[in-house]
Regions:
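OB-fold ssDNA-binding interfaces and closely related basic DNA-contact patches used
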Residues: 2-101, 143-144, 149-155
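Short, exposed beta-strand-loop hairpins at the edges of beta-sheets
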Residues: 138-142
Length: 155
């Protein structure tokens, strides 16, 4: 079988980017096909640790903060594969991780949260947001589905 990937990238220290349909979620934020969107470029060891920990094991779930205020400065979005409990169908959904002013991370796999962040970007431009944007976590229900969204807190 012929290798369809770039041999130079595979045989070097560079990361080979393999295009997939999962990257459609990321294309709303950037034209890059890295498999994720992160609003900051980690430069220091501390920033790299923040990114790693946020992706590997976020501090809390958004569901645990319904009705509470978070001051969002950064966001990470990555596609994840979810199996539908009813149909068994595997589908790609956005995992959204919000980062607050103190570096705490809040995550959910949610198109509602993803769409809320897209709207924030349309209005407030791309993060990092300094100062942060105060938001209140909301949960809506449609049938048996929970939908997370954000309200901007007006001061």
């Amino acid at each position: 079988m012929e290798n369809k990937y770039n041999d130079d990238a595979i045989n070097s220290n560079e990361t080979a980017l393999i295009p997939t349909t999962d990257n459609a979620i990321i294309s709303d934020f950037t034209n890059a096909s890295s498999g994720m969107y992160c609003s900051f470029v980690p430069q220091t060891a501390d920033e790299k640790a923040l990114l790693y920990n946020a992706m590997n094991a976020p501090d809390v779930k958004i569901a645990d903060h319904i009705g509470q205020e978070i001051v969002v400065t950064d966001v990470i979005i990555e596609p994840v594969q979810i199996v539908d409990d009813k149909t068994g169908e595997v589908r790609t959904s956005p995992r959204v991780i919000l980062i607050d002013e103190e570096g705490h991370t809040y995550s959910a796999v949610s198109y509602g949260l993803y769409n809320a962040v897209k709207r924030m970007v349309q209005i407030f431009d791309y993060p990092s947001w300094k100062p942060g944007i105060p938001v209140r976590v909301k949960q809506l229900t449609r049938g048996s589905y929970r939908i997370f969204t954000l309200d901007i807190v007006r001061r």
